[in-house]
Amino acid sequence: ADFPMLGYNKNWVAISVNMFTVAGSAFSSGSVFVVDYPTLRTGIASPTVFSGISSASGGFCAHPAETYSSSEATLYLVSHLSSGSATYKLSTITGTAAAPVYTVGATNTRTGGGWATSGGNIMPQTCTSSCPGTLALIDPGDQFHRNNVVFRNGFVWYAQTIRLPSSTPTHTAVQWTKLTASTGLFSDGGRIEDPTATATNGGKWYGHPSIAVNKNNDVLLGFTEGESDDFLDAAYAFRLSTDAAGTMQDVVVFKDGEDYYEKDFGSGRQRWGDYSHAVVDPSDDVTFWTIQEYAKLRAAPTVGGS
C-alpha cells in the first residue's frame, strides 16, 4: 500500500491507498478502508475494506473528502482519470455507519480543456555558488488529487498540478475545481499559471497545491512557486466567494526559499511538497492556515587546517 489519503464525515473516517505488486512495483488496484466513526470514538476501529478498485473505476488516488458538515451523510471521493480529456470521477460512500456502500461515480469532463500529465523532475530552481555541477530539477507533483479534497455547503473542491500547454508543455500550473456534489458536474474552477514560463526564462512554475474552504465559501490555495532564477518559494492565492467565477486574487509568496534543494534518497526523484496542506481554523471557521515547504540556507562549510 502506498500514499494514504484521508477523508471523513459524520459516519466514517476513510483512508484510501494505492496497491502495488511486490514483483515489479506495478499499480494493481485501489483500496479504501472505511471506519465506523461513532464506534471509532469509543476506541474501536474495525474497517470495512473496499478493494480491487481498478484505474478505470478511479481506484488510483481516490481521495476522500474532508467533510465540513454535521449532517452530510454521503462521503465523496474524487479520482482523476485522463489529463488530455480532462476527465474525473466523483464516487460515493453511503449507507449506515456500520454498513457502508461504495459506489463508483460516472465519468465526467472538467470544463476548460485538457492538459499534459505532470510529475518527474521538471520544475526549475536556481542555485548558489556552492551548488553541485548539475543542479537537479524538482518534482512538482502529478495530476492526481494527492493533498486533499474538501466538501463544503453542497460542493466538492480539489486542486492538482497540471502541465501546459497540453500539446507542447513548457511549465506547470495549479488548477482548482469546484463540483456540484449532488450531480458530480463541474461548477467552477480556474488556474494559477504564468503562460510565458519555461524551464530557463525565469517564468513562474506552480505545483503541489492544497485547498481550503471556509464557512463563507472563501477559498485558499497553498502551493509551491518555482523559477529558473530563484529558489522554491512557499506561496498561496485566495478568493472571496463574491469574486468573479474562475478567478483567484494575486499570488502571495509568504516565505522565500533560502537555498536550492537536492535530495532524492537514492530514488532519482526530487520529491517536494507531498504533504503540504491548507486548512480552516476551527476556532472561527473563517481564518486559513497553510503549511508549505521551502529549503533553508545551508550552513557554511567548516574550514580547518594546520
Spans of features found by a protein language model:
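C-terminal PAP-associated
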Residues: 1-306
